[in-house]
């Protein structure tokens, strides 16, 4: 499933794997020839990755001659979309939860912008600082300022705290049916002796009265046997809040029976990963006719660029 998950160029890659002879015959074997026939570049104003200001960016963003492209691809592919399959899955309601940046976050975003300017102008050696480091720090900052520095204050209106409020309220409302929730964060996974949003969320929920045994980290299930046991507990409702990353809790996670809410605490790099996350709850076998997917974003940070 999902052969085109991140970039439109993946369609070309799939055709090279499956239809090399066809591409050769039609003189489309080189990417430039294929792209000029089936792709259209568009220039749009988008947020700069460091979170400050805007920039014009040209991207390969639209398919062109789409019926002709699909006719060629269908010689090797039998395509079924979720709409065509009409599977008995719950209706998903999406909610964007926006947190305002703190003064500290604003200052740090400005620092990221200054670092990016130095990198772009070549004023700093790439081994010392580069855009990968800057975007990595930007993602951490967008999630919680304490990941950058654990001594910074825990802001009551941060997106982590907004998420905790949400999880608790849904947990409380779903007590009778023992409804369950998934929380996704690819950053700040649990590690000994280091600040982690996983531990922070768990401790805050416990302090509000959620039993510790009803909260689990996917990282604690480090074997297939333990994973199966954990998923069985979520399906039965004995574990009601499961926190994990896309890599460990994406494809292959089958615990949808009582899932009522999914929380995207951070935004993964690839659009296909968001689909994988959503596929855990929008799934056959879920007893709820409607489910909720919450996406948390910190305004004016790298978060906004990613989403």
Language-model segments: what does each one mean?
Residues 3, 7-10, 65, 159, ...:
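An acidic site on a long C-lobe helix of protein kinase domains
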Residues 87-249:
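Conserved Helicase C-terminal RecA-like lobe
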Residues 7-15, 253-255, 306:
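Short regulatory helix/loop adjacent to the ATP-binding pocket of P-loop NTPases
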Residues 9-12, 71, 161, 199, ...:
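Surface-exposed alpha-helical interface segments used for non-catalytic interactions
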Residues 18-19, 171, 235, 282:
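Protein kinase-like catalytic domain
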Residues 3-4, 17-153, 169, 293-307:
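Inter-lobe coupling linker of SF2 helicases/translocases
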Residues 3, 206, 210-305:
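Conserved RecA-like P-loop NTPase helicase motor core
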